[in-house]
Amino acid sequence: MHDKLLIEGKLVAGKGEALAVFNPATGEQIAAIAQADLHQVDAAVLAAESAFAHWGQTTPKTRATLLLQIADAIEENAEAFARLESLNCGKPYHAALNDEVPAVADVFRFFAGAARCLSGSAAGEYLEGHTSMIRRDPVGVVASIAPWNYPLMMASWKLAPALAAGNCVVLKPAEQTPLTTFYLAHLLAEILPAGVVNIVFGRGADIGDALTGHEKVNMVSLTGSIATGAHILSHTASSVKRTHMELGGKAPVIVFDDADIDQVVDGIRSFGFYNAGQDCTAACRLYVQRAVYDKVVEALGNAVATLKMGDPHDETTELGPLITEQQLERVVGFVERAKALPHITVVTGGERVKGQGFYFQPTVLAGAKQEDEIVQKEVFGPVISITPFDDEAQVIGWANASHYGLASSVWTRDIGRAHRLAACLQYGCTWVNTHFMLVSEMPHGGQKLSGYGKDMSMYGLEDYTIVRHIMIRH
């Protein structure tokens, strides 16, 4: 098992405290891995700074060629990545292999092409005797913090655009889920020049703070909780670093009475519970028009009850465990508080699964009110709430009355209504008659407390650049 940091092109053991890494499907410890010490964090940042002097001046073609080599290496090692992601996260192996690893490779391929297509404003004479032009230059050293729900995918979302734009990166995976990142490290060591990517490991409170607060770091990119984002913003405020934040969500799913109910049920069964609901865009906050409310509640409850939980290596398993005992207890707390409300009905699920592992039953809670905690706060587990609504104005108000602003969906056969709602919803993405669909060519990112900045797409590439004006007198 790979467990080494990557610093200045070399794979080295951490010199700090050993952290336990667990298999969520069994609750058993699978490794004890030494985190970096503060000297190693400093060495990683300085290696990135040194490498940037050359890497930042390479041609897009050069960078694209190496990104394509990374994509090839990921595909060639797909089974190894899927095994580690399943072991460390509890994900069904077939989902990691068939859904996530191909998407990771595709992100590197997309940004390999995007690196060669970055455009700027037209040059021109805006002042007599002077010619102006616009450059998009790399930011410099980027500190990237990846989350535990999609360790490999989120690492790719951060590495690919940053490298394509000519930046150097110091990446820290979540302390709970480092295994695929360590495996990636040994591949990157063979492909990239020394120092272009460095990987450190450790707790956020010490290693994360040391990394993001380092004076040589020019930009911090985080996917994580609102609390973590707020902490990093406060921690880095004095150095005025550029920041890129994706901080979670509570996606409203608006179902009108003209929607295809079978399509809705099939979609929410998948999109609300993929990755055990541990997804910032999960279809978790349903608003259903009153005329079809009872029908949707019954059909969705029946469908969700058929989701199969269990062994991640069983090809029929659809739902894995939560990531840690702590996360499981958090989900239990949300559901127990919701169950205590007299107006909420547990349609299916609602309990921790007895036995080994951190499993929670896929859960549908009906009768939730707009002000309920279960409607307002991100649970990050296999739990959806359903609330009836009467008309467009009411549901738009309810959907937007949230601190989050990442993802949303509208289910209707009325194309005019779909356009009206898409124009009004305050979310970074609105899907119509689907949910949870992501492609490398389109941006992903939020507003409000869900953060700012875009992953994927040309917008994601631009986020890792600085716009500069060059004026020449002649």
Swiss-Prot record:
Pathway: Amine and polyamine degradation; putrescine degradation; 4-aminobutanoate from 4-aminobutanal: step 1/1; Amino-acid degradation. Its EC number is 1.2.1.19, 1.2.1.-. 4-aminobutanal can spontaneously cyclize to 1-pyrroline, and 5-aminopentanal to 1-piperideine. HAMAP family: Aldedh_Prr. This is Gamma-aminobutyraldehyde dehydrogenase. GO terms for molecular function: aminobutyraldehyde dehydrogenase (NAD+) activity; NAD binding. GO terms for biological process: L-lysine catabolic process; putrescine catabolic process.
